[in-house]
C-alpha cells in the first residue's frame, strides 16, 4: 500500500511532512602552521599535541582624552582623564599635519563642554532650612552649646554630607573673645571644649528634628518624615557610646574567647532544641512527686486479699487523675452547646473568702456580685440539664467511658486478648484454671455485661495464680528450712551421745571374763622384781580401755527395755572411777 492511499484512508492532506535534509559533511578547517599533506595523514584522529598557538590578550592602550570641567566646582578647573583607546580602524592617513592638529583641538573643546562622567556621584543631601535668630532663641537655645558653635557644626555637616567620622576629625571650634565695655579690662577668651562624636550627633539631631517640626507639624507629616523625626528625637548619646564600646570589645576578642563563645552558643542551641523534652520530663517528675507517700506496712500485701486491695486502690487513683484532667480548673466538666454545667451548692473558694474578709468595700461588693452571677448560672444550668438515675442509665444504655481507643473494636477480640498472657506457660495455666471452672475461652455471647464479668473473672484468676505461685515458693522454702533443721538436730544428738559417760550393768560384768588376781608378792621381792608389777598394771589398763570401748559401742537403750535398775558392786564402781580418771589423763 502506498503512502498516498494511507493518507486518503485517514483523511490526511496529500502533502506529508517535508523530507529530512541530507546531512552535510562538515569539513574541518585545516589549522594554521601545518601543511595539507600532513593534515591528511592524521585522518579523523586528533593530533597528540595541540598545534594551536596561544594568543594572550594584549594590554589595553590608554590615551588622554579632551579636557573636562567638573560641574560641582565653581571655578574654571579643567581636568584630563586617561581613557582606553578605541579599536583601530583603517582611516586614511592625513598628509597635512596642521589639519590633524586643528581637528584635535576642536575635539578637546567639544569634550570639555560636554557633561562630566563622574557628576552622577556628586549627590547633595537635602538639609532643613536654617533657623533664624528668633527660632533659635525660642526653640534651640542650650546651656551647653552656643549660637556660634551650633552654626559651626551645621556648616561642617553641610560641607561633609553627614560623614560623622570626617566631621569629628575636622571639628576645631575656636571660641571668640568676649570684649567688655570698660577700658581698663582686657579681652577674655573662653576655654576650648572637647566635643565627642555622640555630642555632635545629639546636637545636630535635636536641631534638625526641631526645624522639621516647625516646618511640618507632626499631624501633617508623612510616614517617612514622622519616622525620621521620632528617630532623631529619641537619639541617646550614652546608649550610642555604650554600643560602640561593646562593638570594640567584640572586635578585640582573642581566639580563645571566640572559641569559648562558639561552644556556649552551640550549647544554648542544644538546650533550646531539647527544651520541649525537658518540659515533658519535668511535668512527669512533678506528677510522680504528687503521689502520696505510703505509711502502711508491706506485710499487708503478702496475701491475695491485700494484693487485690492494692490493685483496686491504684485503679481508683488512676481514674481520679484522669477525671481531674478532664474537668476544668473549678472542677467543672466542659459541656457542648455553650451550656453552663451543673454544680452543687459548694462553699466559695479560699480566695473568695479572703477577699470577703478584707475591709475594702469595693472589693467585697464585686466579689458578692460575682458570687450572685455564678449562683444564677448554676441554677439556670441545673434547670436546663437533667441528671439520669442509675436505673435510667441502665435502661437507656448510657455509659461513661474513662478512655476510648481509636478505631472499631469487637468485644470478642477484647475478651480473647484477656486470655493471652505474656508467657506461654502463664497462658496454659490460665486456660487450665478456666477449664476447671468450666468457663470457655471464647465467649458465645460477648455482651457488655458479659465482657465486664469476664474481665473480673480473668483478673481474679490471675490473682489466684500469682498467690499460688507465691505459696509454692514459700512452701519450698519451708521444706528446705525443715530439712536443714533436722540435719542440725541429728548432728547435735550424735555429739551428745559421744560426750555422754558410759556405765556397765551387772549382766555386762558377768559376761566379761575377770582375769585371775596376781599372787601376793613380798615387799622384798617387789623391790627386787619391780618390772613384773608394772607389767601387770599395764595389762589392767589395757583391759580397762578395751572394756570402755565395748561399753561405748553398745546401745544405751538396753536399760530402758529392761526397765529394772541393777545393783552395782564395789569392784564395778572402782573400775568406773579408774577408767574416768584415765580418760581425763589421756
Curated annotation (Swiss-Prot):
- InterPro entries per the record? DAMP1_SANT-like, SANT/Myb, Swc4/Dmap1
Q: Where is the composition biased (Polar residues)?
A: 527-562
Q: Which UniProt keywords apply?
A: Activator, Chromatin regulator, DNA damage, DNA repair, Nucleus, Transcription, Transcription regulation
Q: Where is the composition biased (Basic and acidic residues)?
A: 1-10, 486-507
Q: Name one GO biological process term.
A: negative regulation of transcription by RNA polymerase II
What cellular-component terms does GO give this entry? NuA4 histone acetyltransferase complex; Swr1 complex
Q: Any idea which GO molecular function terms this record carries?
A: transcription corepressor activity
Where is the sequence biased in composition, kind Low complexity?
A: 363-383
Residue ranges constituting the SANT domain according to the UniProt record: 137-190
User: What Pfam families does the annotation carry?
Assistant: SANT_DAMP1_like (PF16282)
Cellular location(s): Nucleus
* Quaternary organization: Component of the SWR1 chromatin-remodeling complex and of the NuA4 histone acetyltransferase complex.
Q: Which PANTHER family match?
A: DNA METHYLTRANSFERASE 1-ASSOCIATED PROTEIN 1, DNA METHYLTRANSFERASE 1-ASSOCIATED PROTEIN 1 FAMILY MEMBER
Q: Its family?
A: Belongs to the SWC4 family.
What is the name attached to this protein's record? SWR1-complex protein 4
Instruction: Tell me which species this is from.
Output: Emericella nidulans (strain FGSC A4 / ATCC 38163 / CBS 112.46 / NRRL 194 / M139) (Aspergillus nidulans)
User: What is the gene called?
Assistant: swc4
Amino acid at each position: 500500500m502506498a503512502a498516498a492511499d494511507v493518507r486518503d484512508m485517514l483523511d490526511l492532506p496529500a502533502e506529508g511532512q517535508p523530507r529530512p535534509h541530507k546531512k552535510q559533511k562538515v569539513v574541518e578547517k585545516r589549522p594554521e602552521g601545518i601543511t595539507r599533506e600532513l593534515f591528511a595523514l592524521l585522518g579523523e584522529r586528533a593530533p597528540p599535541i595541540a598545534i594551536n598557538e596561544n594568543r594572550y590578550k594584549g594590554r589595553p592602550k590608554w590615551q588622554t582624552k579632551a579636557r573636562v570641567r567638573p560641574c560641582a566646582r565653581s571655578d574654571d578647573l579643567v581636568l584630563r582623564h586617561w581613557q582606553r583607546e578605541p579599536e583601530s580602524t583603517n582611516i586614511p592617513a592625513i598628509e597635512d599635519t596642521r589639519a590633524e592638529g586643528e581637528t584635535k583641538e576642536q575635539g578637546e573643546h567639544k569634550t570639555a563642554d560636554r557633561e562630566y562622567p563622574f557628576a552622577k556621584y556628586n549627590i547633595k543631601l537635602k538639609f532643613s532650612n536654617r533657623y533664624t535668630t528668633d527660632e533659635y532663641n525660642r526653640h534651640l537655645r542650650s546651656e551647653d552649646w552656643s549660637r556660634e558653635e551650633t552654626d559651626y557644626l551645621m556648616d561642617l555637616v553641610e560641607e561633609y554630607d553627614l560623614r560623622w567620622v570626617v566631621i569629628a576629625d575636622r571639628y576645631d571650634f575656636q571660641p571668640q573673645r568676649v570684649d567688655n565695655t570698660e577700658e581698663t579690662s582686657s579681652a577674655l577668651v573662653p576655654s576650648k571644649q572637647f566635643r565627642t562624636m555622640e555630642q555632635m550627633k545629639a546636637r545636630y539631631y535635636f536641631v534638625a528634628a526641631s526645624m522639621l517640626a516647625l516646618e511640618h507639624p507632626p499631624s501633617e507629616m508623612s510616614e517617612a518624615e514622622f519616622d525620621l523625626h521620632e528617630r532623631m528625637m529619641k537619639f541617646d548619646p550614652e546608649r550610642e557610646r555604650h554600643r560602640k564600646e561593646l562593638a570594640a570589645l567584640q572586635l578585640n576578642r582573642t581566639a580563645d574567647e571566640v572559641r569559648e563563645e562558639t561552644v556556649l552558643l552551640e550549647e544554648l542551641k542544644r538546650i533550646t532544641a531539647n527544651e520541649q523534652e525537658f518540659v515533658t520530663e519535668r511535668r512527669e517528675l512533678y506528677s510522680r512527686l504528687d503521689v502520696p507517700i505510703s505509711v502502711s506496712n508491706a506485710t499487708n500485701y503478702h496475701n491475695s486479699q491485700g494484693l487485690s486491695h492494692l490493685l483496686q486502690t491504684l485503679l481508683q487513683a488512676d481514674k481520679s487523675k484522669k477525671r481531674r484532667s478532664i474537668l476544668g480548673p473549678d472542677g467543672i466538666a466542659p459541656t457542648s452547646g455553650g451550656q453552663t454545667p451543673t454544680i452543687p451548692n459548694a462553699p466559695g473558694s479560699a480566695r473568695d473568702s479572703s477577699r470577703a474578709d478584707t475591709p475594702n468595700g469595693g472589693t467585697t461588693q464585686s466579689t458578692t456580685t460575682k458570687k450572685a452571677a455564678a449562683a444564677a448560672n448554676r441554677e439556670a444550668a441545673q434547670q436546663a440539664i437533667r441528671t439520669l438515675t442509675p436505673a435510667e442509665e441502665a435502661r437507656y444504655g448510657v455509659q461513661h467511658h474513662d478512655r476510648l481507643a481509636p478505631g472499631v473494636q469487637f468485644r470478642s477480640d477484647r475478651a480473647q486478648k484477656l486470655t493471652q498472657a505474656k508467657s506461654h506457660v502463664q497462658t496454659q495455666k490460665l486456660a487450665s484454671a478456666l477449664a476447671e471452672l468450666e468457663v470457655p475461652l471464647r465467649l458465645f455471647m460477648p455482651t457488655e455485661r458479659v465482657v465486664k464479668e469476664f474481665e473480673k473473672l480473668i483478673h481474679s484468676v490471675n490473682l489466684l495464680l500469682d498467690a499460688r505461685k507465691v505459696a509454692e515458693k514459700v512452701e519450698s522454702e519451708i521444706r528446705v528450712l525443715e530439712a536443714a533443721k533436722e540435719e542440725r538436730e541429728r548432728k547435735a544428738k550424735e555429739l551428745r551421745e559421744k560426750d555422754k559417760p558410759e556405765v556397765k550393768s551387772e549382766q555386762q560384768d558377768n559376761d566379761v571374763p575377770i582375769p585371775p588376781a596376781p599372787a601376793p608378792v613380798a615387799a622384798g621381792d617387789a623391790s627386787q622384781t619391780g618390772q613384773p608389777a608394772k607389767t601387770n598394771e599395764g595389762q589392767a589398763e589395757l583391759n580397762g580401755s578395751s572394756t570402755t570401748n565395748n561399753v561405748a559401742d553398745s546401745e544405751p537403750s538396753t536399760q530402758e527395755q529392761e526397765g529394772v535398775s541393777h545393783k552395782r558392786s564395789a569392784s564395778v564402781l572402782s573400775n568406773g572411777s579408774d577408767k574416768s580418771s584415765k580418760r581425763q589423763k589421756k
